[in-house]
UniProtKB/Swiss-Prot annotation:
It comes from Francisella tularensis subsp. tularensis (strain SCHU S4 / Schu 4). The gene is ispE. It catalyses: 4-CDP-2-C-methyl-D-erythritol + ATP = 4-CDP-2-C-methyl-D-erythritol 2-phosphate + ADP + H(+). Keywords: ATP-binding, Isoprene biosynthesis, Kinase, Nucleotide-binding, Transferase. GO terms for biological process: isopentenyl diphosphate biosynthetic process, methylerythritol 4-phosphate pathway; terpenoid biosynthetic process. The keyword Transferase applies. ATP binds at residues 98-108. Signal peptide: none annotated. Catalyzes the phosphorylation of the position 2 hydroxy group of 4-diphosphocytidyl-2C-methyl-D-erythritol. HAMAP family: IspE (MF_00061). Its EC number is 2.7.1.148. This is 4-diphosphocytidyl-2-C-methyl-D-erythritol kinase.
Length: 275
């Protein structure tokens, strides 16, 4: 197969507008309900396919070794599932989405890799047809393959297109590393089998992130600071990034200027579509 010109793809961040944990499944995953929307915060992945039969991944930051890297795992799953052999590709990842933030950066990169492989090897394959494969890579990967704001159930692979009214989002991230496994097993995580109707609009009174209680119990000082800034800050995923939504960009800019702690922060917009 001949070399082709390098092709660039954007790999977007997501937030969970709410996250409701239902129960643990026999396979170790948890059933959940959530509403995903995207942000215009994005990584850039450049794919250069070639005849080398080698997979090379580089980045502007330190990344996991091949066998632990979701991009590499996505390539191997694609090969196994669609019987595509002898893949040769150089992938350059320019990271802008912070890692370990609950913004889905690694999952987004894996999904973008599946789409790039599809475009090159199996262009007749639809995004929706790749969702079962995406789910094998992780609970957040399917939404990035789907590419539209969506209500999600199951482990995140059962998706219903559901737009969210576009807003600005102020993101803040403390220098805190979250153990997803620890949060899922925490006594402070309250699981409920009561389902929320996907037909509801965005209702802050019932739509919250079940992991916030775990975070608040573990980091009470930061949690108090957050509430003093604005009580409507919400956590995405298992954190450690929090966001505040508003249609008023100036309000968020003013609030960002008030932050007097060494926190990473971004002012971004929500997106309903990324493809």
């Amino acid at each position: 197969m001949a070399n082709i010109k390098a092709k660039k793809y954007y790999s977007y961040a997501k937030i969970n507008l709410f996250l409701h944990i239902l129960n643990k499944r026999p396979d170790g995953y948890h059933n959940l309900q959530t509403w995903f929307t995207f942000l215009d915060l994005k990584d850039q992945l450049t794919f250069s396919f070639n005849n080398s039969r080698e997979i090379n991944i580089s980045s502007n930051i330190s990344i996991a070794a091949k066998q632990d890297n979701l991009v590499y795992k996505a390539i191997k799953k694609f090969q196994q599932s669609y019987r595509v052999q002898d893949i040769g590709v150089d992938i350059e990842i320019k990271k802008n989405i912070p890692m370990g933030a609950g913004l889905g950066g690694g999952s987004s990169n894996a999904a973008t890799t599946l789409i790039a492989l599809r475009d090159y090897y199996l262009p007749q394959l639809s995004n929706e047809e790749m969702i079962p494969l995406a789910a094998k890579l992780g609970a957040d990967v399917p939404i990035f393959v789907y590419g539209k704001s969506a209500w999600a159930e199951g482990i995140g692979e059962i998706l219903y297109h559901k737009d969210f009214s576009p807003q600005y989002a102020l993101l803040i991230k403390p220098d805190i590393h979250i153990s997803t496994k620890e949060f899922f097993t925490s006594e402070d995580l309250i699981k409920s089998s009561v389902l929320i109707s996907k037909d509801l609009g965005f209702d802050k009174s019932i739509m919250h992130n079940d992991f916030e209680n775990v975070f608040y119990a573990k980091y009470p000082e930061f949690s108090q600071y957050l509430k003093e800034l604005d009580s409507d800050f919400r956590m995405t995923g298992t954190g450690s990034c929090f966001y505040l939504l508003s249609a008023d960009k100036n309000k968020l800019e003013q609030l960002a200027r008030k932050i007097n702690k060494p926190l990473d922060k971004w002012l971004v917009k929500t997106l309903n579509y990324v493809y």
